[in-house]
């Protein structure tokens, strides 16, 4: 399997509950039966992890057209975003998110097909690329992500990236420290963080590399690009589809970390024999 069953089973359990019910409106009931949601879900996970084309993943059980149609249907109903939020809430309840320390950084990946979130990449000889502005907590758990063209600077993406904290409502610590690299070293960034009431640690331009607490976001970016081929080379052209795959990838990452951290703290019937 593309993802171990100990991780994908609890994700599917929550995902299945979010899928809206579909009524059979055919008057005679003699049409082709609807492909099971579980089959489509597993195929989409394969697309995400392996990065293969839909036509390569499709087989006699599910066509590529069904994959795309069901994917768009679930996106319209907000299933992927809701799944990501459920995973975050579960991790926060059982382990606890380190929201007192936040880290933001950008990551540029190839986008050979272009699209709504593609631009000329400054690190790939002007070829099409996509930038992900990622927000993580102090332990590297992905909290939110904003996508834009690769030619977009990191600083303008900081405000919409920090807006992802709104998903927690008022359950935020009184004091938050944001760690940023030298790409955010500007007066506008400091004014923005001062207006939000956040402390900040920003690396200085022209000084030697200062990793500090920022290494966790680099690790999470590596989890995205090395663990999910679809995110390493972005072949989707619509922003909402990219966001859906990022949300699914984040759900897998958070669930894996949750099981890993809970493995030494809790006991449950389906607890894996080895710590993931």
Identify the meaning behind each predicted range.
Residues 1-276:
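Short alpha-helical elements
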């Amino acid at each position: 399997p593309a993802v171990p069953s100990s991780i994908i089973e609890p994700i599917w359990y929550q995902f299945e509950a979010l899928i809206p019910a579909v009524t059979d409106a055919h008057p005679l009931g003699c049409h082709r039966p609807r492909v099971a949601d579980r089959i489509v879900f597993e195929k989409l996970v394969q697309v995400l992890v392996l990065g293969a084309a839909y036509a390569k993943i499709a087989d006699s059980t599910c066509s590529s057209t069904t994959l795309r149609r069901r994917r768009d249907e679930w996106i319209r109903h907000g299933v992927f975003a809701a799944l990501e939020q459920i995973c975050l809430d579960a991790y926060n309840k059982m382990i606890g998110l380190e929201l007192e320390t936040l880290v933001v950084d950008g990551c540029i990946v190839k986008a050979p097909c272009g699209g709504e979130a593609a631009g000329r990449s400054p690190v790939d000889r002007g070829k099409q690329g996509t930038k992900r502005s990622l927000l993580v907590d102090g332990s590297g758990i992905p909290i939110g992500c904003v996508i834009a063209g690769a030619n977009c600077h990191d600083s303008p993406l900081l405000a919409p990236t920090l807006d992802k904290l709104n998903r927690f409502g008022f359950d935020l610590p009184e004091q938050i420290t944001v760690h940023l690299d030298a790409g955010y070293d500007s007066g506008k960034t400091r004014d923005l963080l001062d207006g939000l009431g956040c402390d900040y640690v920003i690396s200085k331009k022209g000084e030697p590399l200062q990793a500090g607490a920022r290494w966790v976001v680099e690790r999470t970016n590596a989890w995205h690009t090395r663990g999910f081929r679809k995110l390493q080379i972005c072949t989707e052209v619509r922003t909402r589809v990219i966001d859906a795959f990022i949300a699914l990838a984040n759900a897998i990452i958070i669930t894996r970390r949750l099981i890993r951290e809970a493995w030494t703290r809790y006991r449950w019937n389906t607890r894996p024999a080895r710590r993931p």
